[in-house]
Structures are given as C-alpha cells and as structure tokens.
Amino acid sequence: MFRRPFIIALLCIVVHVVNAQSVFHKQLADSALTLTKDKVSYDPSYFTIKYPNGDVPTDKGVCTDVVIRTYRKMGVDLQKEVHEDMSVYFSLYPKIWGLSRTDKNIDHRRVPNLMTFFKRKEGALPITKKPEDYLEGDIVCWSLGGAITHIGIVANKKSRNHKRPLIIHNIGAGQVLEDCLFRYKVIGHFRYQP
C-alpha cells in the first residue's frame, strides 16, 4: 500500500538529481566556451598566486587553466578543493615532481593531480571510442606521448560532420574550440560536480 508512493517519490528525486546534474554540466560547457573569447598565450611558467581563488595572469595559461577557470565561473575553486584533498591524502597523489608536501601555486595546475582528484571524488567515467559517451561539460584527459598529458572540456557543439563533440582546451594556441576528442590517446574521462 505504501510501497508504490514511496517508489514514485524515490523516482521523482532521482529524476530531479539527474536533471540538476545535466543543467550544471550544460552551464559548465557554456562557461568554458566563453573562455575562447579571451586572448591567452600558452605559458607553462611557475607562478606564485594567491590562495584561495588564485589564478595565473589572465592573458596566460595552460590546458589545466581552462578547466580551473571554467569551474571558477561556476563558483568552484579547484585550487582550494585540490589543495585541501592533497593536504589530507598526499600519499594518494602522483609523485612525479619529487615534492614532499603540497604547493598551492601549482598542484591544481597539473593534469595527473586533477585526474586523481576527479577519481577520488567519484567523477571517473568509462573511456570509450564512442563520441556519444562524451557529454557537454565532461572533462577529458589525454596522453600526448611520453609523460606529457593534456586536459580539456567537452563543448555543447559538434564537429562539422556532427559525429563528435568539440573540445575547449589550450594546447599551445590559446583557449580554443577544436575537433580533437580522439586525436590523442584518451586516458581519463570525468564528470565532476561538487
């Protein structure tokens, strides 16, 4: 007797949560797209930045800065979130740079650290070769060969043949919208909403 209303109420909650999540990721993709209007030079230099809500100079940046700036437009400070998680779980993060403690200036600007953070926050999704699995607002990470990694955000726009979503990223030509989803080896696929 009470079971049916309970199931209906539960389904309504699930639909509401899924819908709210899709709205967030649509807004995330829209926010990322606005970054392509800014003139930004690729600059991998180490910068001392404020904390929290620190950023490198607005006319400079790398691939991770696209993700960081996009989430910041949505009110999410990845610098703070990554730093706080690394401070508690430092041993779970990559040891590629030989550091013995966190660094608020750079930790959030490293692709392997962002990948670890998104995995820890249960944002990891399957890596596939199917373009339809990559939805607007998703985060994609690639290996460019050797130890070089890259990251970008799935846009809400499609390739000319309408088969693949475009990517907003910075691989050297500034913050651009490009058809490059499967150009490199995909090593991470994430959907993160705090």
What kind of feature is each model-predicted range?
Residues 24-29, 87-168:
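...with weaker cross-activation on analogous glycine-rich loops/strands in unrelated enzymes
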Residues 162-194:
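Low-complexity, Gly/Ser/Thr/Pro-rich intrinsically disordered linker/tail segments
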Residues 44-64, 77-101:
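Acidic helix-start/capping segments at beta-turn-to-alpha-helix junctions
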Residues 10-19:
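Hydrophobic h-region of N-terminal signal peptides that target proteins for export
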Residues 33, 37, 68-76, 83, ...:
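Sec-exported extracytoplasmic/periplasmic mature domains
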Residues 3-10:
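Sec-dependent signal peptide recognition
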Residues 19-61:
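Active-site-adjacent structural segments surrounding the nucleophilic cysteine of cysteine proteases
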Residues 49-58, 100-104, 125-128, 173-178:
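Second-shell loop/turn segments in exported
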